[in-house]
Design a protein with these regions (language model features):
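Gly/Pro-rich, tryptophan- and cysteine-flecked surface segments typical
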Residues: 1-485
């Protein structure tokens, strides 16, 4: 199965050309047991950024789409909501399903994708991912502002005797009939195999898990102990096709996820013209730090240049993995104009890690079409259970020298509508570029607050070229990295 090509405009995305947005939303895979916890976390950025009051509704559903719980979530006590419904009260040992967060406003919110995080805590690991899927609003369906023909890739598969890969898709508001789908796998030698499989009829709001080992029993020998790649062709009804993708250990002790992205070898995108695109590799002292360029790039020949002066040439369809020093990577296209989107990732383990699974953070590249951005916010761990690093780095290679000599850093919590504030200067700002733990920035604050997820927030009045990452790290050496909103 291959879907009809869809044109994906990055220029429209940058411009916020989504029509009238009075509802924004996000769907998340949700699992709960005595050894596994899912938390849906988000900041009241609608009020903080633009002064917009919103109503938030959370709907918890089973895997077959049945509505089990619907409730209103409020920012009455603080600026952060950390939501994890107790689904084990009825005696269920393990609950698996999905949570939909819907946000409603009487003003145009501009972006229909809510900026929300999911945090997954397994026995030995922690992992996070930002919003990936959403159910379209009726007016978006009527206006044709939908992408439901799924050509999704950028999914690293690590299958071994101890590890199984998986992907999660969420159907929308109508029945999706039974369908023939296809799975294309790529190994470290860039050898490919295509596997057809069936997806049963999906009821409205159903969640479906794709496990490659079920469809290709020889996948472990095909990968031969090295990371590979998967891409999927499928269709949904009235739902955005982005998938949750990841790997878990077969004993359930570790679980690491990121999100898929468009297969740009099949979908189309606009171009960024001549010149370079850039990617930041943060100086965070990870172990086994690897940069991944997924194989689903616009057709053509490319070159990647590292901070050490090494150069790698690759073409569409090839998965490229390199180790590199921290710094700025440069991408160019050797046979035409640079596409607006090249999907990349960072993958690594903590320096002191005994973890089996690395984190993987799906990213992309920055180029001259990306507009200046003045506000950033991202999740951090508050309290003693987990630690967080905050990395704020000026992309001077693209936006010129950072001229701000002070930075006002806000920390929002679930306990107060007002933030903690720290004004940083000179050398402190330089240190943020290398990464600082939250307790180094707000030392007493960390000691006096209960364990929770909060959010940092910065507003840059004079410089719009910052790039930010945060981490969540546990005491066992598991780490997760995500870029900011």
């Amino acid at each position: 199965m291959t879907n009809k090509k869809v044109y994906i405009s990055q220029k429209d995305n940058y411009a916020g050309a989504f029509g009238l947005v009075y509802r924004s939303s996000a769907n998340f895979y949700f699992r709960q047991s005595n050894s596994f916890k899912t938390t849906i976390s988000f900041m009241d950025y609608w009020r903080i950024k633009r002064g917009i009051s919103v109503m938030v509704v959370a709907s918890t559903r089973s895997m077959d789409g049945k509505l089990l719980m619907r409730e209103q979530l409020t920012f009455k006590n603080g600026s952060i909501i950390n939501f994890s419904p107790d689904m084990l009260r009825s005696g269920i040992a393990i609950f698996e399903g999905a949570i939909e967060i819907e946000v409603f406003a009487s003003e145009n919110m501009v972006i229909p994708y809510s900026a929300i995080m999911a945090v997954y805590e397994a026995e030995n690991s922690i992992s996070m991912v930002h919003s990936y899927s959403r159910t379209y609003s009726p007016h978006e369906v009527e206006e044709g502002r939908t992408i439901s023909a799924g050509e999704e890739g950028c999914w690293s598969i690590l299958d071994t005797q101890r590890v199984a890969s998986f992907a999660i898709i969420h159907n929308g508001s109508d029945i999706q009939p039974e369908q023939s789908a296809s799975l294309e796998l790529t190994n470290v030698l860039n050898k490919k195999t295509s596997v057809p499989f069936s997806i049963p009829a999906l009821p409205p709001y159903a969640t479906f898990k794709i496990i490659p080992q079920h469809y290709l029993p020889s996948i472990i020998s095909f990968l031969d102990g090295k990371p590979g790649n998967a891409a999927v062709s499928f269709t949904l009804k009235n739902s955005f096709t982005r998938m949750l993708v990841g790997n878990n250990t077969t004993d359930g002790s570790e679980f690491q996820v990121t999100h898929s992205n468009f297969n740009f070898a099949r979908h189309e995108t606009d171009n960024a013209g001549e010149g370079y695109a850039f990617m930041l590799v943060p100086p965070a002292k990870f172990r086994d730090l690897t940069v991944v360029v997924y194989p689903e790039t616009t057709k053509g020949q490319y070159k990647l240049e590292t901070p050490e002066g090494k150069a790698y040439e690759f073409k569409s369809g090839e998965r490229l993995e390199i180790t590199t020093a921290p710094g700025i990577l440069k991408f160019s296209k050797l046979d035409g104009k640079l596409p607006a989107r090249i999907v990349t990732a960072l993958t690594a383990k903590a320096a002191n890690s005994n973890a089996i699974l690395p984190f993987e953070c799906s990213l992309g590249v920055l180029h001259k079409l990306r507009p200046l951005k003045g506000t950033f916010w991202g999740i951090v761990a508050i309290g003693k259970k987990y630690r967080s690093r905050l990395i704020i780095y000026p992309m001077e290679v693209l936006y010129g020298e950072a001229i701000d000599n002070e930075l006002q850093l806000y920390l929002y919590t679930q306990e107060s509508r007002e933030p903690e504030v720290r004004l940083m200067h000179g050398d402190e700002i330089l240190q943020l570029g290398k990464g600082m733990y939250l307790e180094e920035i707000f030392p007493r604050f960390q000691e006096t607050h209960e364990d929770q997820y909060g959010y940092f927030y910065i507003r840059c009045s004079n410089y719009g070229g910052m790039y930010c990452y945060t981490t969540l790290e546990n005491e066992l050496g598991s780490v997760s990295l995500e870029h900011s909103f």
